[in-house]
Regions:
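Conserved active-site beta-strand element of glycosyltransferases/polysaccharide synthases
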Residues: 25, 43-45, 51, 60-65, ...
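A structural signal for well-ordered alpha-helical segments within the folded catalytic domains
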Residues: 45-49, 88-93, 127, 131
């Protein structure tokens, strides 16, 4: 996203957690199965939510370096909206997505981390955090209906999913991201673990 496509780190096919909505292609069968973007999200975290549902339904999300995307028009939302509104949408949608997509044990494990995250976020965007929490309380029945649909179609458990998206790209990718990436593709552990 907004980087030089000729950079070596972008020339490796990778299984990824989420694709950008403006540069995403989906199988029709996947759309028929999991649906499209959540209509209640408006913007922010909508493609991550969709990709999470795809993973749970048994699909993979893959970054393909040979693809070419022409993004005809873009709007800088930071110029169009106040930061507090942007953060509100981001917090709001993130909470709703976790409630819909994560298993109950994963939600319980993540809950203390989220509480800490939102506690510190309150220092910067108190209104945004409060509005996000109120919205999710108000929308809780609707979110639970969506959750039932997602969980009914689940084919992948959270443990397997997290191992996949944390392993691929593997940790060494991030090492090369901050160091020299020219040898990344020749890393033996990557060649052995990436099977597409």
């Amino acid at each position: 996203y907004r980087k030089d496509a000729r950079d070596p780190k972008y020339n490796t096919r990778l299984t990824i957690n989420s694709a950008k909505g403006a540069a995403m292609m989906l199988r029709r069968s996947a759309i028929d199965r999991v649906g499209t973007f959540d209509e209640d999200f408006f913007i922010y975290f909508e493609e991550t939510d969709l990709c999470h549902k795809l993973w749970l339904a048994g699909y993979k999300v893959i970054y393909e370096p040979l693809s070419v995307v022409y993004h005809y028009e873009a709007v800088d939302t930071h110029k169009q909206m106040r930061n507090s509104f942007i953060m509100y949408l981001s917090y709001r949608n993130r909470i709703a997505s976790y409630l819909k997509n994560l298993s109950v044990p994963s939600i319980l494990r993540l809950f203390p981390v989220l509480c800490l995250f939102y506690f510190f976020s309150c220092a910067l965007y108190p209104t945004a955090v409060l509005r996000a929490l109120v919205w999710n309380i108000w929308m809780f029945p609707k979110t639970m209906n969506k959750r039932r649909l997602v969980q009914r179609g689940r084919k992948l458990d959270d443990t397997t999913l997290f191992q996949t998206i944390w392993r691929d790209p593997p940790l060494i990718y991030y090492y090369y991201l901050f160091k020299s990436l020219k040898f990344y593709r020749h890393e033996p552990s990557l060649v052995e673990t990436n099977h597409y």
